[in-house]
Amino acid sequence: MTEKMQQKLSDSKVARWSVLALVAFTMLTGYILTDVMSPLKPMLEEQLGWNSTEYGFFTSAYGWFNVFLFMLIIGGIILDKMGVRFTGLASCVLMIIGCGIKYWAISDAFSMEGELFGWKAQVMVAALGYALFGVGVETAGITVSKIIVRWFKGKEMALAMGLEMATARLGTAMALSITVPFATYFQSIAAPILLCLIMLCIGLITFLVFCVMDRKLDASAGADEEEAEEPFRLKDILVIVTSKGFWLIALLCVLFYSAVFPFLKYATDLMVNKYNVDPELAGNIPAILPFGTILLTPFFGNLYDRKGKGATIMMYGALMLIGVHLLFTLPILNEWWFATIVMIVLGIAFSLVPSAMWPSVPKIIPEKQLGTAYAMIFWVQNIGLSMVPLLIGWILDTYCKVDNGTGKIAYDYTLPMAVFTGFGILALFIALLLKHEDKRKGYGLELPNIKG
């Protein structure tokens, strides 16, 4: 009897890596819009009259619906019930609608004046669009995580997650580096957002191609992981919330990402105010961070796949994060080259923790509850991503305004950077607790992912 060499489509390297390329591109388009406003902060203040508190309020909108309306957790439940294809397509549509609202608010076509819910109408409408987009991109993120587990389990899962994160970081790098030149060339702050809208539509098309391949996986011979609609059970959430390892991962996630993503929202402004970098070039230094992760996240993911040491990798990443923000806090070497070196180190730290953190979740939580588990982690993360930018904006406006003699708004970033340093210290403490819990429970975080 002839033995079948490949029982499932996911056993084909070409097929599973093609799937990764398709869904990673979809996420890249989402992450371009996520950070496209960061380099525009000075232009928003000068041309549209925004202040740091309004900018922080707008940035905090990313997690409004996810956190306060529990949309992300609902999305995770839908993911586990309806499957990756339905949830992914719905997420792409939400991203496009949210981006469209945000573009309208920032464009010249927006004519609403006065206030809306106590904020400038333009700020509030842009924030609502960003909040809707946030539901889409975060739900897409957990969907793609489950897709990778589905196609790469027992194979190169951490490497695949690392490459997906690297592609997402490429989107961040593009947002930070090309946004201001693009806006300047077209003489419109809204032009980069329109570009993002077009990219998101292309991302929807690539996800549709993935859906065709995923259906073929279900139909392939011996496919024992066919997606089926499952009824939601309360005990699925109880399995997750009663796991100490899950909560340690979730806390590490919110602390680590709160020290990175909100920092990136203000990093361009930091380069202008502390390191005297030209505003048109200032976004290039923070862009080093995602470019570094593009190379290093897959490297560390591959290391985790083959050698293990996931908990240790997360500890080292948190330790480096503390050092980076401490150097940004101290009033030393206010030169662009020093900021560049420190940003490179931050890129290494930002590669270490996610490359081990996300592939560790399937070792703690059963696969059938992964969608809900990832959603709950992202929900906790979104609390930080919502509150921290608003906190930093308020600190800047309240305590950090300085007179630099030019007549333009300027800020002293010492206090905000001290806050980010504090997040890093707490992240290291949680990473130590996670390693201890792994030894006690035997999750296998220090073991390789590739079987055999």
Predicted regions and their residues:
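C-terminal transmembrane helical hairpin of 12-TM major facilitator-type secondary transporters
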Residues: 310-357
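Cytoplasmic helix-loop-helix junction between adjacent transmembrane helices
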Residues: 123, 129-167
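Helix-to-loop junctions at the C-terminal end of transmembrane segments
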Residues: 69-84, 296-309, 396
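C-terminal ends and interior cores of transmembrane alpha-helices
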Residues: 93-118, 319-333
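Helix-loop-helix hairpin linking two adjacent transmembrane segments in secondary transporters
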Residues: 164-215
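Juxtamembrane intracellular "pre-TM" segments in multi-pass secondary transporters
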Residues: 2-13, 217-249, 450-452
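Extracytoplasmic gate region of multi-pass secondary transporters
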Residues: 37-41, 243-297, 354, 388-389
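Conserved MFS/SLC helix-loop-helix module at the cytosolic interface between two early adjacent transmembrane helices
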Residues: 69-112, 123
